[in-house]
Amino acid sequence: MKRKILIIGNSAKEYAIAKKLSEKHDIFVTPASDAMKEFATCLDIREDASAEILEFVMENDIDLTIPVSIKALKSDIVELFNQNNQTIFAPVKNACKLMFDKALAKKILYKLRIPTPKFGIFEKQNMAMDYIKNLKNPFVIKTDDSNSATVFTNTQTAKTFIDSLFIEKNKRVIIEDYIYGTPFSFYTITDGYKALPIGSSITYKHSLEGDGGQLTSGMGACSPNYKLTLEQEYYLMDNVIYPTLDYCEIEGNPYLGILGVNGILTEDGRIFVLGWQSFMQDCDATAVLEVLDEDLYELFKSCVVGSFSDEIEGINLYNKYASSLVLTCKNKVNAENAILGLDNLDEETKITFYPSVNKNKYLEFEAEYGANIILTTSGVTASKAVDKMYLEAEDIEFKGKSFRRDICKFKI
């Protein structure tokens, strides 16, 4: 039976979950991107307009609402829906502080004795300057309320950056050691009490090959993470996921939804946790969902109605790998820049669009400066998925096309 599902948000991860759910259900999205119109009914309601969204849901008999965007999760939408007996799959606002308050997240990691890079939190510029004097290069600087982070190998450059952060009225700055290793994400689904793994990924955050350039929201991914052993997954469940759920419950904010962990896996097998995710990331959502063999509506709803703990014993995954590649445009031009070759791709290849991509008057998708497309392919091995991904990437054409050429390009 087809259900009506509302997704809140318009980035690549919202596109990925909406497209996956549209295979079986009727999808509504707000404030949808232009590309989503091909498979969803697109609305024009602000993602933090909780009362207006609730009114739409009640008037249109929506079966399930899934707030994904940060702005939506920071609003009171979950509490408002619960008060009005509407089915919503997401954590309450106070439980989400783990993701949106980076300084708080580091303090909680320390409190729960979860391994995390050595760090300092600073509200005064001079104290931050003193801290980096004795740090070994490289190190990472990030702000309290931002997902971006910058790696520094030069103290003087870092001081200039810290100057700019405090000039911009950032209240707190976080400085932490840089950990060498493989970045990973590990995702679970939970009703607040029981949690089950739903997927993992190797993520590539640096903009250039060989992990050079700036840290980004992601340039590619592979799922499942073939470097993460079963024992390490057990470790994450027992020492990160469940302590986090216990903490949220003790604080009076049981965490219901997708609970993800971002971390670093070192060469000697140690795990360092960088922070939590309230959903999948733009760069890995399509890959993780491609491997997931579940009716997401039934899975999500079981958490909301209270049947998850009793009825769901495990999560089914396809016996395959999926790899994703972010295609960016490096041209800052206002001229038309049609994306060509999409019709030539294999029918099993998944295309996920960023919200910057719109259609021109000829009904062609157009590339804009920055991230545009996530191309995802699958195979029985990670290497087969990756080889196919790069072959497909060559078929897509637009001016200024750029992508990393080393995603999963090492011994598997």
PLM feature spans:
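A conserved helix-loop-beta module that forms one wall/lid of the active-site cleft
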Residues: 89-150, 156
